[in-house]
């Protein structure tokens, strides 16, 4: 578990080719290895890629280079290199119990993505 700020900094570092606050944390080649789409499926070595069927993220306007992670407990973090955008949404999906499906039922992640892209990248949409 972490904070939205920590995750935003981590994903911004990945967008910067492994560099953050003037310090090289990972080599650009390492970042590429973890974020480039696999030949075998929609995942990269470290993250999901859009081609894997994240229609809400794609529909929102994310580029095909977008990578990220959605987690069981409600974590949702995406980085869109083409649009220079980091998206972090932290929720407590498993409250009050692990069978809670309100995030999916209300399409919370997809609706949040859509609003971010509409307001920041496509204000006319």
Role assignments for model-derived ranges:
Residues 1-125:
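Catalytic loop of the DD-peptidase/beta-lactamase superfamily, centered on the K-T-G motif
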């Amino acid at each position: 578990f972490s904070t939205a700020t920590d995750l935003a900094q981590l994903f911004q570092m990945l967008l910067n080719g492994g560099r953050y606050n003037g310090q090289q944390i990972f080599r650009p080649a390492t970042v590429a290895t973890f974020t480039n789409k696999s030949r075998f499926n929609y995942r990269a070595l470290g993250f999901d890629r859009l081609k894997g069927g994240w229609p809400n993220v794609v529909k929102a306007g994310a580029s095909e280079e977008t990578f990220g992670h959605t987690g069981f407990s409600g974590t949702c973090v995406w980085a869109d290199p083409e649009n220079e955008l980091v998206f972090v949404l932290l929720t407590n999906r498993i409250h009050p119990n692990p069978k809670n499906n309100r995030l999916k039922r209300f399409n919370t992640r997809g609706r949040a993505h859509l609003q971010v892209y509409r307001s920041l990248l496509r204000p006319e949409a």
